């Protein structure tokens, strides 16, 4: 796109450069914040999964008992609702895990072995941790998408917009400087011509 080599355009380009320089630090700070948040979310997800894996190992004995006794009912682990809230991090709306409700049907305590309550509770804890880790994965995905967009904007400002604007300013400044020098030269030449004409007229009158 051609740039108008005028004083007004020079002023406009300088204002544009000032705007870019004002917004760039904000974008860079947002990029750093998003990166730190993603690392923190990934660390929390890893910690939650470690707890779930440890508990899952403990649950394996109950799974074996369920299989042998035939008392296992899949409805005991049916998820009724996953309660979430939402928060804003660096302008990104992300889900936050609160709790999970299970639709556990009532069962006859006299007919079901005593260990069923403990086994169901532990297995529900595992599922709850798995669901929490899933929500943390959602957070990381949303923050990651925003980080990519912000990084693209930072690169656009740093590598394209600011260098282009500086180049335009230099081009206009050089052109206007050349025009000013040319105007001074023309002025001096005009003055010299006037002096020469005046001298010649004086010589003719003698």
Curated annotation (Swiss-Prot):
MF terms from GO for this chain are: ATP binding; proton-transporting ATP synthase activity, rotational mechanism; proton-transporting ATPase activity, rotational mechanism
> What's any GO biological process attached to this entry?
proton motive force-driven plasma membrane ATP synthesis
Which key words are in the record?
ATP synthesis, Hydrogen ion transport, Ion transport, Transport
The text of the family note is: Belongs to the V-ATPase D subunit family.
Q: Which PANTHER family match?
A: V-TYPE ATP SYNTHASE SUBUNIT D
The record ties this protein, via NCBIfam families, to: PRK02195.1, V_ATPase_subD
Q: What does this protein do?
A: Produces ATP from ADP in the presence of a proton gradient across the membrane.
* Descriptive protein name: V-type ATP synthase subunit D 1
């Amino acid at each position: 796109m051609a740039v108008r080599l005028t004083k007004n355009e020079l002023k406009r380009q300088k204002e544009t450069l000032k705007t870019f320089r004002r917004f760039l630090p904000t974008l860079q700070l947002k990029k750093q914040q998003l990166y730190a948040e993603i690392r923190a979310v990934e660390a929390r997800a890893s910690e939650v999964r470690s707890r779930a894996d440890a508990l899952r190992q403990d649950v394996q004995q109950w799974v074996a008992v369920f299989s042998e006794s035939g008392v296992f009912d899949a409805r005991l682990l049916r998820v009724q609702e996953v309660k979430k809230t939402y928060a804003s991090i660096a302008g990104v709306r992300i889900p936050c895990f609160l709790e999970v409700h299970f639709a556990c049907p009532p069962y006859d305590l006299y007919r079901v072995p005593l260990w069923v309550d403990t086994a169901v509770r532990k297995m529900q804890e595992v599922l709850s941790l798995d669901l929490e880790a899933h929500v943390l994965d959602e957070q990381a995905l949303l923050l990651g998408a925003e980080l990519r967009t912000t990084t693209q904007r930072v690169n656009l400002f740093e590598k394209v917009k600011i260098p282009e604007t500086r180049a335009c300013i230099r081009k206009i400044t050089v052109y206007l400087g050349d025009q000013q020098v040319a105007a001074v030269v023309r002025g001096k030449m005009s003055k010299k011509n006037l002096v020469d004409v005046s001298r010649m007229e004086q010589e003719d009158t003698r």
